[in-house]
């Protein structure tokens, strides 16, 4: 069952930079660090299938596609509904209502922090938000970073975020410094 889910996730996310298979894999392995006891089958399916569709609203599209995939691999209807709910609530503004959904939610946010986060958000700033300059990218990354910690739900998530946010603040301060060059005189 896991093999089929993994292969499907690889096939659906191949060639993507910010929301590709590597992201899903990091989210799964990060999520496992956030709680000691959880339903691994549920967490596995939700994390590997949460970004399989990019069309917005991607959480809705991914949840619908996940339902078909999980039905095909033999998940029970009740577990399919839980996976869908986790996927639907994984976005930063989401309000997950059970442990595995909170784990996915927080791990997804954590993957947008630190150096990986800076890289993912820079890609996203251009492709999803239409940033036209490095200054625009910097603004979007700072905005996300500033909101991220308050959206984390689990104690271990907040602890993991601290080091990542500290790194981001140093790196973004350096980027801001490098971008703050005066325009050359035309004289």
Residues covered by each model-derived region:
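Extreme N-terminal tail/first-helix region
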Residues: 1-15
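An amphipathic alpha-helix signature
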Residues: 2, 6, 28, 63-67, ...
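Onset of an N-terminal alpha helix
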Residues: 2-6, 21-24, 42
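Divalent metal-dependent phosphate-bond-processing catalytic cores, especially two-metal-ion Mg2+/Mn2+ enzymes
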Residues: 11-38, 49, 94-187
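Short glycine/serine- and small hydrophobic-enriched flexible loop segments
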Residues: 32-33, 67-71
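His-Asp-centered metal-binding catalytic motifs of divalent-metal-dependent phosphohydrolases/nucleases
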Residues: 40-58, 62, 66, 82-92
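Basic, amphipathic juxtamembrane/active-site segments
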Residues: 65, 69, 123-124
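Short helix-capping segments at alpha-helix termini
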Residues: 72-79
């Amino acid at each position: 069952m896991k093999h089929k889910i993994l292969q499907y996730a690889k096939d659906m996310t191949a060639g993507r930079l910010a929301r590709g298979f590597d992201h899903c894999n990091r989210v799964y392995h990060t999520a496992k660090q956030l709680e000691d006891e959880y339903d691994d089958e549920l967490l596995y399916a939700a994390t590997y299938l949460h970004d399989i569709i990019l069309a917005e609203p991607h959480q809705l599209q991914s949840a619908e596609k996940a339902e078909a995939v999980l039905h095909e691999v033999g998940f029970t209807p009740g577990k399919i509904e839980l996976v869908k709910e986790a996927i639907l609530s994984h976005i930063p503004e989401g309000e997950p209502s059970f442990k595995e959904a909170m784990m996915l939610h927080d791990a997804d946010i954590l993957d947008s922090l630190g150096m990986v986060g800076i890289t993912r958000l820079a890609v996203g700033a251009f492709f999803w938000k239409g940033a036209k300059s490095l200054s625009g990218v910097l603004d979007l990354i700072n905005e996300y970073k500033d909101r991220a910690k308050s959206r984390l739900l689990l104690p271990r998530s907040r602890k993991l975020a601290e080091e990542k946010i500290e790194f981001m603040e140093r790196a973004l301060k350096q980027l801001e410094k490098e971008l703050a060059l005066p325009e050359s005189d035309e004289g």
